[in-house]
């Protein structure tokens, strides 16, 4: 099989003779789409790309119908990183940061001190799940590894990389006992696949997925599953922005229009699209007319 072209996808794989599964993610266009909408400093670009890769890996590894949201928060120079990805594999991301407090080469602990990571699964049906842990690691790869070892009680490792406008990720997870019933054999097997993954060099991350996996595990029987494409898509809309105004109540919404000089601007923090509502738009919203009569929408 030849390598897949540069595109956006996740791909699961399994070791036929080991109790280990894996997942690979490649994000080119969707990561570029996020970066094109904001002038993020390099350290912010890297962390946001890594968080996008982690989110896509989790969507690929979990079975649910709905939305997965990852938020990293802190009181530091980067107070928020946020990525959303749907079960249809539509992804978007954003960051908030203090531009004058982000030196080149800053570490995660410097950029997000005392931070925490929140994972939310918002299903189409059923109850919402949310879990929060400290950002306990030298980098996001370590943070996610620690999160899942604690929550799932299974050996799990993440490797995340973002460079040159491309984001990549690798997930390895030990499966429940099946092919290898012996404890020592299972542990040796796990350490084997992890040790090989640790040999990945920075310049190798942007190579084709099959080339890379073959280089790492050519002595193992590795079975690749079909790729699952991803794409950037922002779920914002004029209707949602109008609903946000309606939630304020008619009196406060009209007062806000007056305070803003006759036109309220609502910005999407993900894609930078701007929605404008004047007094007649707000009156229509509360008259039950919806948002059909539009003031401007701008990028």
Curated annotation (Swiss-Prot):
Disulfide topology: 234-236, 268-271
KW Cytoplasm (keyword) present: yes
Q: Which InterPro entries match?
A: Heat_shock_Hsp33 (IPR000397), Heat_shock_Hsp33_C (IPR016154), Heat_shock_Hsp33_N (IPR016153), Hsp33_helix_hairpin_bin_dom_sf (IPR023212)
CDD domains xrefs: Hsp33 (cd00498)
Superkingdom, natural source: Bacteria
Q: Which HAMAP family match?
A: HslO
Q: Per its record, how is this protein called by name?
A: 33 kDa chaperonin
- Which organism is this protein's natural source? Pseudomonas putida (strain ATCC 47054 / DSM 6125 / CFBP 8728 / NCIMB 11950 / KT2440)
Tell me what gene encodes this: hslO
């Amino acid at each position: 099989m030849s390598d897949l072209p540069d595109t956006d996808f996740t791909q699961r794989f399994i070791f036929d003779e080991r109790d280990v599964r894996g997942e690979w993610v490649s994000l080119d266009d969707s990561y570029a789409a996020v970066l094109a909408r904001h002038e993020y400093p390099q350290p912010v670009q890297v962390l946001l790309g890594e968080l996008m890769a982690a989110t896509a890996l989790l969507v690929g590894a979990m079975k649910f119908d709905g939305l997965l949201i990852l938020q990293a928060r802190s009181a530091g120079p980067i107070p928020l990183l946020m990525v959303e990805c749907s079960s249809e594999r539509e992804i978007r991301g954003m960051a908030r940061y203090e531009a004058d407090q982000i030196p080149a080469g800053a570490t995660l602990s410097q950029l997000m001190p005392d931070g925490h990571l929140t994972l939310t699964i918002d299903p189409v049906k059923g109850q919402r799940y949310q879990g929060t842990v400290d950002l306990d690691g030298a980098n996001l790869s370590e943070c996610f590894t620690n999160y899942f070892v604690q929550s799932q009680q299974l050996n799990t490792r993440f490797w995340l990389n973002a460079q040159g406008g491309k984001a990549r990720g690798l997930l390895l997870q030990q499966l429940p006992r099946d092919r290898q019933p012996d404890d020592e054999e299972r542990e040796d097997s796990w350490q084997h696949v992890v040790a090989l993954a640790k040999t990945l060099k920075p310049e190798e991350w942007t190579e084709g997925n099959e080339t890379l996996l073959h280089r790492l595990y050519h002595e193992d029987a590795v079975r690749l599953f079909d790729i699952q494409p991803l794409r950037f898509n922002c779920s914002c809309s004029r209707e949602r922005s109008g609903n946000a105004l309606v939630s304020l109540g008619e009196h406060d919404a009209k007062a806000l229009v007056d305070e803003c000089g006759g036109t309220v601007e609502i910005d999407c923090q993900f894609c930078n699209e701007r929605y404008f509502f004047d007094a007649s738009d707000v009156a229509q919203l509360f008259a039950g007319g919806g948002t059909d009569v539009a003031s401007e929408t701008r990028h």
